[in-house]
Curated annotation (Swiss-Prot):
Belongs to the monovalent cation:proton antiporter 1 (CPA1) transporter (TC 2.A.36) family. NhaP2 subfamily. It comes from Pseudomonas fluorescens (strain SBW25). Keywords: Antiport, Cell inner membrane, Cell membrane, Ion transport, Membrane, Potassium, Potassium transport, Transmembrane, Transmembrane helix, Transport. NCBIfam families: PRK05326.1-1, PRK05326.1-2, PRK05326.1-3. It is found in: Cell inner membrane. The keyword DNA-binding does not apply. InterPro entries: Cation/H_exchanger_TM, FAD-bd_PCMH-like_sf, FAD-bd_PCMH_sub2, Na+/solute_symporter_sf, NhaP2, RCK_C, RCK_C_sf, Transptr-assoc_dom. This is K(+)/H(+) antiporter NhaP2. Pfam families: CorC_HlyC (PF03471), Na_H_Exchanger (PF00999), TrkA_C (PF02080).
Length: 580
């Protein structure tokens, strides 16, 4: 490879990445997922478009694994362990039982549609059986979904790859050796995949955390150390025949949920690296496919994709979530719809090609086609389906910017900046009248281009910028004070006519509003009553019906319900009482 060739590769790579980023700006306008646009750029530049011939499957496999490791590390860093209280076991059920059911149903349909034997059909089912972390993390961000739904989908996508990889490798071995039966040793292999991945991931994450917090380095080196450590955990786990994908996700989870030096620098760097990984991975996968090869299989492949989307995935979700009573029917329906397929099925489809199996090119083309249909149909309709099934909640008020304050090694102090809108009650109030959360301080106030020295007598005006020092757990309380309210009164319409304290006793509430207790302890707090009615760990947005009245969880205080919204039937709304 001479200098001219190397320079040409740099030029082509830079042009493709730049084109992907620039064209992705059309995503929100067209309502098409960014990943589809990046995939399309790769296809247009490929053999049937720009003429770039790329058929190096081992390189695609390498790029895909590297990119997924970075994406899962970033996803783990941003996943809060608190979300496990509502979604860990349901997500693991979907990641195991759900993948098995999807694989079986999709495999039987594939065998019938493409005249394959049952093992070959099941291999297709295994290849497309798991949801994709890159697609899920990318498309769910900022959609305002309730915590139970978001956490279930994210944890599922981060933990279901071991099952899909295990099934794919097992079925490839069976086809290569001519086996037709299953053995108990396969179950042992699966347990080993999960076990080694879990132990190495958690242990590696803890060691990385200690290393980052104890070693003094230049600030810019900490993100690189975390990325290198994550890839090391990924590689070691794979070498031990465990699940590297699960391990690197858990590694990020451990680091992201403990005080860590240069936290914001690490997150910002990983955000950019995760985007670069997604762009590079989907560009390579787009270049790898030959679009005209998809046309002969388009109709049966579309039928298989719709079968998986409309039947196999919904049935697997219904069975997988059957033991978990806290999930409403509409939440199950949404989780069933958002079975997003992305890079993982395409990467798994490279396995049969590298093994030299018959029909390997068919497996690859089918996987690519199903991913394309999934992203176009499910990804594009995600916001609309979320509203239709009512799984969205009003967004938490957030500062317009936030920055870390590295006061000490594991400092969690942050600087939050709020812009005061005209609708906030604090406009016209003096600073001394504000009920600031404990442990927070107003550090500065900007009015126009001028920096003011805030004092207790300073009166707040529309457009003021307030700089507040605090911790992440102070954000909900600070948001109520300073953030711009949701448009069109979304929070009032969503939570009901009044919002009651969770500590309010049922006896007082029922007496005030004329409700019937019917054997319920009048001293029971409203929060405990709603938790019992939900049937599991509650989240903001959970709704229950009692006394012909809708009760909605409005605020969570840790694991406990803090406030409850109440909506009365039309025409029977009583006067205000305990509401805030």
């Amino acid at each position: 490879m001479n200098a001219t060739t190397i320079n040409s590769l740099f030029l082509i790579g830079a042009l493709l990445v730049s084109a992907s980023i620039l064209v992705s700006s059309l995503s929100s306008r067209l309502g098409i997922p960014i990943l589809v646009i990046i995939l399309a750029v790769g296809m247009v530049a490929g053999v049937d478009g720009g003429g770039i011939i790329f058929d190096n499957y081992p390189t695609a496999y390498l790029v895909g694994n590297l990119a997924l490791a970075v994406i899962l590390l970033d996803g783990g860093l941003r996943t809060r362990v608190a979300s496990f209280r509502v979604a860990l076991w349901p997500a693991l059920s979907l990641a195991t039982v759900g993948v098995l059911i999807t694989t079986g149903l999709t495999g039987m349909a594939a065998a019938w549609l493409f005249d394959l034997n049952i093992i070959q059909g099941l291999l297709i089912g295994a290849i497309v059986g798991s949801t994709d972390a890159a697609a899920v993390f990318s498309l769910l961000g900022g959609k305002g979904l309730n915590e139970r739904v978001t956490a279930s989908l994210e944890i599922e996508s981060g933990s279901n790859d071991p099952m899909a990889v295990f099934l794919t490798v097992t079925l490839i071995d069976m086809l290569a050796s001519g086996q037709t039966g299953l053995h108990w040793s396969l179950l042992t292999h699966l347990v080993r995949e999960f076990g080694i991945g879990g132990v190495v991931g958690l242990g590696g994450g803890w060691l990385m955390l200690q290393m980052v917090n104890r070693i003094n380095l230049a600030t810019g080196l900490y993100p690189i150390l975390v990325i290198a450590g994550g890839l090391f955990v990924f590689a070691v786990t794979n070498a031990l025949h465990g699940s590297g994908f699960l391990a690197v996700y858990l590694c990020g989870l451990v680091i992201g949920n403990r005080p860590v030096r240069s936290r914001h620098g690490i997150l910002h760097m990983l955000d950019g690296m995760a985007w670069l990984a997604q762009i590079g991975m989907f560009l390579v996968l787009g270049l790898l496919v030959t679009p005209h090869d998809l046309l002969p299989i388009a109709l049966p492949a579309l039928g298989l994709a719709l079968w998986m989307i409309l039947f196999a995935r919904p049935l697997s979700v219904m069975v997988g979530l059957l033991p978990f009573k806290a999930f409403h029917g509409r939440e199950k329906a949404f989780i069933a719809w958002v079975g997003l397929r992305g890079a993982v099925p395409i990467i798994l489809a490279v396995f049969p090609l590298m093994a030299g199996l018959p029909h390997a090119q068919l497996y690859f083309n089918l996987a690519f086609f199903i991913v394309l249909v999934s992203l176009l149909v499910q990804g594009t309709s995600l916001p609309w389906v979320a509203k239709l099934l009512k799984v969205t909640v009003p967004p938490d008020p957030a500062p317009i910017s936030r920055a870390a304050l590295e006061v000490h090694v594991t400092s969690e102090w942050e600087l939050f900046v709020y812009r005061l809108g005209a609708e906030k009650w604090c406009i016209g109030a003096a600073l001394r009248e504000l009920k600031m959360p404990e442990g927070t301080r107003i550090a500065a106030l900007f009015r126009g281009q001028q920096l003011l020295h805030p004092s207790g007598s300073t009166v707040l005006e529309v457009g003021d910028l307030l700089c507040v020092i605090g911790h992440e757990h102070n954000l909900p309380a600070l948001g109520k004070l300073f953030s711009q309210a949701p448009q069109r009164g979304l929070d009032l319409r969503f939570f009901g006519d009044f919002v009651l304290e969770g500590d309010a006793q049922l006896g007082a509430v029922s007496a005030l509003y004329g409700l019937k207790l019917e054997g319920i302890d009048p001293d029971m707090p409203l929060s405990r009553f709603i938790t019992q009615k939900v049937g599991g760990a509650p989240v903001v947005g959970d709704q229950v019906e009692w006394n012909n009245t809708i009760w909605t969880v409005a605020v969570m205080d840790g694991n406990k319900i803090g406030k409850v919204g109440v909506r009365f039937p039309e025409g029977s709304r009583p006067g205000p009482g305990l509401f805030l």
